[in-house]
Every structure is written in C-alpha cells, then in structure tokens.
Curated annotation (Swiss-Prot):
Signal peptide as annotated in the record: none
Gene Ontology biological-process annotations: translation
Protein name: Small ribosomal subunit protein uS11
InterPro entries xref list: Ribosomal_uS11, Ribosomal_uS11_bac-type, Ribosomal_uS11_CS, Ribosomal_uS11_sf
Quaternary assembly: Part of the 30S ribosomal subunit. Interacts with proteins S7 and S18. Binds to IF-3.
Keywords noted in UniProt: Ribonucleoprotein, Ribosomal protein, RNA-binding, rRNA-binding
Function, in words: Located on the platform of the 30S subunit, it bridges several disparate RNA helices of the 16S rRNA. Forms part of the Shine-Dalgarno cleft in the 70S ribosome.
Domain of life: Bacteria
Gene Ontology MF term list: rRNA binding; structural constituent of ribosome
Family assignment from sequence similarity: Belongs to the universal ribosomal protein uS11 family.
TM ranges: none
UniProt source species: Xylella fastidiosa (strain 9a5c)
Amino acid sequence: MAKQSVVKIKKKVKRVITDGVAHISASFNNTIVTITDRQGNSLFWCTSGASGFRGSRKCTPFAAQVAAEKAGRAVLDYGMKSLEVRINGPGPGRESAVRSLNNVGYKITNIIDVTPIPHNGCRPPKKRRV
C-alpha cells in the first residue's frame, strides 16, 4: 500500500482596505469597471460583456449598472466602506454605474471625470455615414 502524505496549505489572508478607487471606463461599445486600492493595485474588475450582455446590449446603461453592482459586491469582502469614482469616456453607462455603486452601500467621496480632452491635437475620425 502506498504511503499517503498530508500537505498543509496556508490560507491566503485577505487584507482590510477601507477606501478605494473605482475606475469606470465608459466607451460607446462597452463599460469597464475596475476597483483598486489607493495605490492602484487592482482588486476586482467587471465589464458589461463579462456580465452576460452581448452585441448592442453591452453599451446600455442597464449593462453598466449590472457590471458595477457585480464589481461592488465582490469587493465588499475587503471591508471597503468608501470609494472615489474616476469616470473616463463618453459612453451611456457613466451615471448608472455610479448610481449602482452608491446603491450597493459605498460612501462615494469624490466623482472625478478624467476623460482626456484634446487642446486641438489630432484630427478626429471622419463622421459615420449610416
């Protein structure tokens, strides 16, 4: 009979983070929600596409709301109480993602729009003809 060995596995200790930063990138095609700590280390991320929406339903405000709720609930295990929100992009899921983070139970301290605005830099792409 083979001798069985017992291997002890150390349990990973979750650190306690009281406040963090929620980066919301809202493009016209998708919404990406990333929650980090103050140093910028990513704790959890979720997108509209990863939440089960495909095609044109990814860019709806409801899809952004579901993605933000999913990310917010996943980070509750770290003991996070307050969030600073940084919004990037012109997409339709901007406000609904912030509202859903507030509904999860976070105290939102700041809302900062970090969308890059050109001071007459590169020429924009041509207009769509549908």
